[in-house]
Amino acid sequence: MFDGFSNNKGKRRSFFRFGSESKNNDSEKSVRKPSVPSTIKKSTNIARTSTAETSAPDIPPRSPNRNAHSRSHSIQAPLQKETLKNTNPFLNAEDTLGDSLELTQSKEASGNDHKGIEYLQENNIIGQRTNPFTTSANSNAHFSKIKRSRPPPPPMDMKSITTSISNNTTKEEIESNNDSERDSIAISSTHNQHRRQRSEAEKLVDDIENYINEHKVSSGSSLSLDTSENSDTKASQDKLPVDVMEAPILRNVSAESSLSYVKPLIVDNEEVNKASNGNLVQSDHLKEFSSNLDDGDDKFSFSTSASGKSTKSLQQVSKDESSGFKAAHFDFAYKSNEHLGSDGSIASARKPLRITNEIDSGSSNEDDDDGLQEKGFVDSESKAFINYASDQGSSIKNDVSTQEPELPSHRRIFRVVNEDRPSFYLNSVNDTGSLTDKHSFDTASSGEYDAKSNFSSQSGLSISKGSKSTVLAALDSNGNTKSSNKTSELNSLNSISESLVPAAHSFNEHTVTIPATVDLPNPVHDAPSERSVKCSPLTSVVSNKSEKSVPLVSSYVEELRLKYYKTSNFLQAPPNLPVALKQKNNLIQPKNIKVKLRTSSKQIGIKHGKVKQKLLALETRNEESDGTATGLKNKINVDHTKEFHKLLGKENETGSISKKEGTDAEQAEDYLKDIPGDEAYNSDDIMAPLREKRGQNGSVDSVSRSNTVVSYYTRSQNRMRSGTLDNDYVNRQKLPTHISLQDYRDANARSNISRQDSVSTTNSDVVDLSYSLGHGLRVANPDSDPE
């Protein structure tokens, strides 16, 4: 019974200790078994002593307290163990190489020691069958510490991967390749790890991205922005510009969304002044531009409005008597001088320029002489002149060869923000520096928007290289915009005029020559010009409401309200607007509600509290005082104040006097006109008695609220201070208003007694105790009980 209990206890002890404890139990069992031959016992003892020496050499093999030693060894074992098996594939390549070298060295060192042990292990199978825990773990104890669950992953060199990518690939393709590599690595590494479940928000975001991509693919087919049609006519095929590589490309964002990246228009002076290295424009290039307007180079993005209506989605229709209704908007893109080859992602991201109320930059042949007098940079003070050279008989090739427009050397990205009025004008009607004549504005306002007719009547405007610097200097004198944007604006305007080269049979070339001493006029027009008034019905947003005069709030007031009141309902005006704007520009104008009060006998004595305020607020102005109505003559207007003075006998004896003497009676009763508190009864304003009248501000005799109220500063200065060390505040004199500052300083110097230097004199008046001995010590806080 006791033997069985001790055996079970020993088995249980060997269950928790896998190492040397299981060997002890096996040795005890082998001693108790009489059927085991002596040869096998010797071999097992030899093998166990050798393994005990290799695994735990500090424990003697035959010590009586062997279990205690093994228990203490098992407690201290975690301090000597190796680190946990790390399966992170993103370890450094150096660490993984070092670990693999150490592993091979330890295997080579331990392989020599275990050659004899493996030979004895083959003969030891019969003795180890009795205990299931004494498998090959004891013999391979040194191997179990070093052996990993799987070999470390091969080192990855990301630099060699990124350098192997060709130069013509975009950043989008590089990021997609890197993401696919990371995803494959993450899938293989998280085989035995927990996977984070995707939330509903992430699934919704993915669904939205898929929808945006599908919408982008479907809308991209409608936009004819394919650059492969005219690739054979290009003389040079440039690489991808640097601006596209520098721009952060947002994936899964549609090209029409407001989140798409737009590079700011910041151009250095060097890029403006240097000659562009573009190719010469051929004559077939001009014909090709008029035929195919869909090739785009410059990137235009439109800001999305808060109401959801965009300028791109609007198709304004203008009425023309001759040609009927025509669309006021038409899309075309600028000609590309940089080919991207087979890059389809950037070609699909190009935006067409939408020009509303397109204006001819030149005049027709009939109005050439009239346009000379009206257009151009003309200044009366500087007496600038314009050389207008038009050769009617010359062909297009001669015009192109004499002066050819410069193609832009870099890709421009524009941001159209003013979506309500997308037509922009350089100057106004009063400005003589306009580049267009009246005929172009008349055609623009009448609504004739035919692409072929416009381009046939157009004439290219190009500025020579010599005059570009003068235009830059002239624009620098203009103070409307910042200096950083002036060069970029001129560059964009110049490139627009150069790239919009029309195909026409009669090609007229205008060369504007500006002297170096000419300063451009700089008028600042706050009022809307005639130009914007003409084109306003074309550029106004389409609305299904009736077009009657509604006193709506202006956009300036709405901006101010949004600025000052973040949660504004557009019904309250900002605080710093004038009163006229506050009263006349509100959507809901309050009207005076006329209420006739039936005062009962209970309400007569009420002269205080909230009931009086309600009575004052409900009373309206005295309508009988106008005197315009005819039926007011028979009505008796009772003045209770005058009756009260008559009752007290304060009225003058000359009550009924003639009109000549009426002025004296009015002067005698002037005090009745300004009764304090009477404004509350004659107006709708309850707070009228507290407000000062305009006439009383300058009067000295009248006592008003501002005269009687003492400010906090003067009150704190005049208060009597007790318990402070600063007792000189009594001697401080107030600064009067009728004397000068020097008199104040002299009076202050007389009041302050200061110690003077000793003077050697025989005069007895000088010797004074206060001067010789000083004031002495005085107690600042004397005790209340004098001793």
From Swiss-Prot:
Keywords: Acetylation, Cytoplasm, Phosphoprotein. Residues 36-54, 130-142 have a biased composition (Polar residues). The modification N-acetylmethionine is found at residue 1. The modification Phosphoserine is found at residues 63, 254, 313, 342, 345, 390, 477, 492, 546, 683, 699. The keyword Phosphoprotein applies. Residues 160-169, 218-230 have a biased composition (Low complexity). One of its GO terms (cellular component) is cytoplasm. It is found in: Cytoplasm. Residues 1-115, 130-200, 217-238 are annotated as: Disordered. Residues 170-184 have a biased composition (Basic and acidic residues). The keyword Cytoplasm applies. Its main location: cytoplasm. Present with 155 molecules/cell in log phase SD medium. This is Uncharacterized protein YDR239C. It comes from Saccharomyces cerevisiae (strain ATCC 204508 / S288c).
